[in-house]
């Protein structure tokens, strides 16, 4: 296959195994963008944890200061009343209880986030086989089971991301779009890493943030030199 001059420049720019300063890494990502759509910027973070052990599982959420650039659809399970009205006022795309559950069972699952109040979990629990495999099951650890659904909806719409270390101990997360300002992407990444440090399992030994890599949807992965980040 014949490489374009641009692709050759990208291949030369990204040296395997080399850690790049955050500013240079972001510039490389933007140079490597080749899709006709606005690509997302993703981060992969290898953690020094053994997820096979229950006391070393990492799961949480972070409200990115510059958002994700995505239009997030949110469904909320909440009894009718003031809290339901708060959720709607915050921008929820669907609010309900048994009626909402019936719609989901009928195939209406076009949501990115599902939120529930604690007293609504009796209804949500029946949807485990539908929501669980899609990563939509509400969970208090990531802020999707909340006594304040209005605030939870606002956070979800404003750029809250949820994450969980996979079997290899790696966190995968979206931190924005390639058309974001460089500083916005940097701030989003730092906010995520700071929150991950806060929830470091006490049983985790050695280096916790072992490797941080950025990539665009269709671009190469770029390893980040963590010393160029502000993680305090």
From Swiss-Prot:
Instruction: Write down the Pfam families for this protein, in alphabetical order.
Output: Ribosomal_L1
Please provide one cellular component term from the Gene Ontology annotations of this protein.
Answer: cytosolic large ribosomal subunit
GO annotations under biological process? regulation of translation; translation
Q: Which GO terms describe its molecular function?
A: rRNA binding; structural constituent of ribosome; tRNA binding
Q: Please indicate if the UniProt record lists Ribosomal protein as a keyword.
A: yes
Keywords (A to Z) from UniProt: Repressor, Ribonucleoprotein, Ribosomal protein, RNA-binding, rRNA-binding, Translation regulation, tRNA-binding
By its UniProt entry, which NCBIfam families does this protein fall under? rplA_bact
Subunit composition? Answer: Part of the 50S ribosomal subunit.
Protein's job: Binds directly to 23S rRNA. The L1 stalk is quite mobile in the ribosome, and is involved in E site tRNA release.
- Quote the protein name from its UniProt record: Large ribosomal subunit protein uL1
- What is the species listed in this Swiss-Prot or TrEMBL entry? Xylella fastidiosa (strain Temecula1 / ATCC 700964)
The organism's lineage? Bacteria, Pseudomonadati, Pseudomonadota, Gammaproteobacteria, Lysobacterales
Gene encoding this chain? rplA
């Amino acid at each position: 296959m014949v490489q374009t001059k641009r692709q050759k420049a990208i291949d030369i720019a990204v040296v395997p195994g080399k850690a790049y300063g955050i500013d240079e890494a972001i510039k490389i990502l933007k140079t490597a963008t080749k899709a006709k759509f606005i690509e997302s910027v993703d981060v992969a973070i290898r953690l020094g944890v053994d997820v096979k052990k229950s006391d070393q599982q990492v799961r949480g959420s972070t409200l990115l200061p510059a958002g994700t650039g995505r239009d997030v659809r949110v469904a909320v399970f909440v009894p009718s009343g003031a809290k339901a009205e708060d959720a709607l006022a915050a921008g929820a795309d669907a609010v309900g209880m048994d009626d909402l559950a019936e719609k989901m069972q009928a195939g209406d699952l076009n949501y990115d986030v599902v939120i529930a109040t604690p007293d609504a979990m009796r209804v949500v629990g029946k949807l485990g086989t539908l929501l669980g495999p899609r990563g939509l099951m509400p969970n208090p650890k990531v802020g999707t089971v909340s006594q304040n659904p209005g605030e939870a909806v606002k956070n979800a719409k404003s750029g809250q991301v949820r994450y969980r270390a996979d079997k290899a101990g790696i966190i995968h997360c979206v931190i924005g779009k390639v058309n974001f300002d460089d500083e916005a992407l940097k701030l989003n990444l730092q906010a995520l890493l700071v929150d991950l440090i806060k929830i470091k399992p006490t049983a985790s030994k050695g280096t916790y943030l072992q490797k941080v890599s950025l990539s665009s949807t269709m671009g190469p992965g770029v390893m980040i030199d963590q010393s160029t980040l502000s993680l305090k």
